Amino acid sequence: MSLTNTFSDLCKSFAPDAFAINYTLAKNPELSSHEFESVKTIGTVLEKHGMDVTYEFCNLPTAFKASAVKVDNPKGRLAILCEYDALPEVGHACGHSASGSMSVLAALTLHKMQQDGVAFNMDIDIIGTPDEEATGCKVDMCNAEVFKDYDFAIMVHLDGEET
């Protein structure tokens, strides 16, 4: 089976977890710096699938970090960023409940691929980046050099276009 098919099949197997996160966050929107239940929801799913989660990452009460893929002698490091805060009065109109869920879906899929024997040449972490709608916490994380040891970072974000 090709890696593309393996990835696709595993994504489908983790889809119920991603949908559950999305629905829970959408029904219970938490504003910037107050995403305590959101972090618990995401962390619980990551832990359920064998990932160790560091809460209050970089001294931010609602940030987290978990290793999806860990290898000996990595040739690079990737950060998958995960947003989950909501907007006042309109909740997840910006789509962080869905985009954060998709970041978790990617991390779970890659984690399982490694468990199933797929060889990776890089470390891959998922990093929860809270407080995006108010102060843009990723800027604070950059200033704290959280990303200095990563070769690149990716994230999912929704837009208003239909596909």
Where are these regions (language model features)?
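Histidine/acidic-residue-rich, glycine-tolerant segments that coordinate divalent metal ions
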Residues: 62-63, 67-68, 85-93, 97-98, ...
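Phosphate-handling active-site elements
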Residues: 54, 73-76, 106-125
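A non-catalytic alpha/beta surface segment that caps or lines the substrate-entry region
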Residues: 29-72
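N-terminal capping segment at the start of a domain
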Residues: 2-36, 85
